Amino acid sequence: MAKKIIGELKLQIPAGKANPSPPVGPALGQRGVNIMEFCKAFNERTKDMGSFNIPVVLTIYQDKSFTFITKKPPVTDLIKKAAGIQKGSDNPLKNKIGKITKAQVAEIAATKMEDLNAKSTEGAIKIVEGSARSMGIEIVD
C-alpha cells in the first residue's frame, strides 16, 4: 500500500547550503520532518550545482518520512549569471543594464527545458527572452 501524503512543500535553497536555520528548519520542523536528514540529503545532491538557489519540492508522508525533487536553477539566476549582473533593472523599459546573446538564451532554454511548460525549444527560448526583457537585459545576435 502506498504511503499517505500529508503535505507538499516548495522551497528555494542555495545549492549545498541547506541548514536547520530559517527558512528550512521552521518549515520542516512544524511538519515533523527530520531536518538534519533532509539537509544532508539535499546538500549531497546539490553540492556540484554552484552557488545557485535550487527549487526543491518536498513531499511529506504520514509516517514523517519524505522524498524530494530538485529542479534546475531559476531562469532569472541563469540570466543574471550570463549577463554578469547582480540584479535586474528597476525600470526595464528605460534602463537596459546588460546584454546576452541569442546563443546564451538558447543554452539557458536547453538547461531549463524540463522545468518550463514549453512544448518546443522555440517556445522555451521565447520564455527566456521574455524573462530577460523584463529584467532590462538586451538580447543581441
Swiss-Prot record:
<comment type="function">
    <text>Forms part of the ribosomal stalk which helps the ribosome interact with GTP-bound translation factors.</text>
</comment>
<comment type="subunit">
    <text>Part of the ribosomal stalk of the 50S ribosomal subunit. Interacts with L10 and the large rRNA to form the base of the stalk. L10 forms an elongated spine to which L12 dimers bind in a sequential fashion forming a multimeric L10(L12)X complex.</text>
</comment>
<dbReference type="InterPro" id="IPR020784">
    <property type="entry name" value="Ribosomal_uL11_N"/>
</dbReference>
<comment type="similarity">
    <text>Belongs to the universal ribosomal protein uL11 family.</text>
</comment>
<keyword id="KW-0687">Ribonucleoprotein</keyword>
<dbReference type="Pfam" id="PF00298">
    <property type="entry name" value="Ribosomal_L11"/>
</dbReference>
<dbReference type="Pfam" id="PF03946">
    <property type="entry name" value="Ribosomal_L11_N"/>
</dbReference>
<protein>
    <recommendedName>
        <fullName>Large ribosomal subunit protein uL11</fullName>
    </recommendedName>
</protein>
<dbReference type="InterPro" id="IPR006519">
    <property type="entry name" value="Ribosomal_uL11_bac-typ"/>
</dbReference>
<dbReference type="InterPro" id="IPR020785">
    <property type="entry name" value="Ribosomal_uL11_CS"/>
</dbReference>
<keyword id="KW-0699">rRNA-binding</keyword>
<dbReference type="InterPro" id="IPR020783">
    <property type="entry name" value="Ribosomal_uL11_C"/>
</dbReference>
<keyword id="KW-0694">RNA-binding</keyword>
<dbReference type="InterPro" id="IPR036796">
    <property type="entry name" value="Ribosomal_uL11_N_sf"/>
</dbReference>
<dbReference type="GO" id="GO:0003735">
    <property type="term" value="F:structural constituent of ribosome"/>
</dbReference>
<dbReference type="InterPro" id="IPR036769">
    <property type="entry name" value="Ribosomal_uL11_C_sf"/>
</dbReference>
<dbReference type="InterPro" id="IPR000911">
    <property type="entry name" value="Ribosomal_uL11"/>
</dbReference>
<dbReference type="GO" id="GO:0070180">
    <property type="term" value="F:large ribosomal subunit rRNA binding"/>
</dbReference>
<keyword id="KW-0689">Ribosomal protein</keyword>
<dbReference type="GO" id="GO:0022625">
    <property type="term" value="C:cytosolic large ribosomal subunit"/>
</dbReference>
<dbReference type="GO" id="GO:0006412">
    <property type="term" value="P:translation"/>
</dbReference>
<keyword id="KW-0488">Methylation</keyword>
